[in-house]
């Protein structure tokens, strides 16, 4: 293919590839080990919903019933929620809605790669603030960059992927107050942390956008159900770049069935995951040459001094 056909911003990109893994136990994708359809009540609810939803009809383009259920879960209004085909689509919608070519997008590193990739696709200028030694986030420099650059978007993964660290809500508020533009807080792993959501501050900040997902604590990664939470005018703006029918009837039904039994699902999934995480962290640090870092997520980042030897 003639590469001149491509947008100039992606000509140097390499295709995103997920490596083939032959092992039966896969832990590098931070997936849940629990199948939502192993819950009889959820499975029955899901099948009942599908039986009432003909496949020849297009899905509800705004997933109104699902928005209401998600709003009830996170304690906001339905009009403050927008659903997407996974958190990845929500990230893409945010960037496509707000970022022009040349606009600055501020991130901390290491973090979820998709923030920078999506920003570069539209020609954004990605500015990164690297962690301090020990994967401690450089909060002082990051806040200074927000004040200095006034980025078009500031993106914070909290808890962070891949380090597992979390920033307090008080610091996130400092960033929100310092920025005249949207600040995106990705809370994909929040259910494992025990910390309250920044969504509790939604009414105070018109520049706050929160990303949530049902992939991790609920175990719906294969069904792709992410959502944004923001004040209504921001949700309305994000809807301008959304595909009309972006969420199929299967995912909507699964999301509703899961949320109808959310307390049971979370009680089953989250405490054992936290216990396994803490056990793994402790045991890894007993191995010579291995350093595991504290985590509030469902994974543990580790450094191996001599990888080939291990």
Question: Model-predicted segments: where are they?
Answer:
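Short beta-strand-to-turn element immediately C-terminal to the catalytic PLP-Schiff-base lysine
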Residues: 35-37, 225-232, 302-303
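PLP-dependent aminotransferase class I/II
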Residues: 207-286, 291-293
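Short loop-beta-helix segment that forms the pyridoxal 5′-phosphate
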Residues: 59, 71-93, 108
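Active-site pre-lysine segment of PLP-dependent enzymes
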Residues: 120, 137-149, 162-183, 187-217
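PLP-dependent aminotransferase-like
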Residues: 97-156
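Conserved C-terminal alpha-helix-loop-beta "cap" of PLP-dependent enzymes
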Residues: 285-291, 299-310
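Short acidic capping loops at alpha-helix termini that bridge into adjacent secondary structure
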Residues: 77-81, 102-104, 187, 206-207
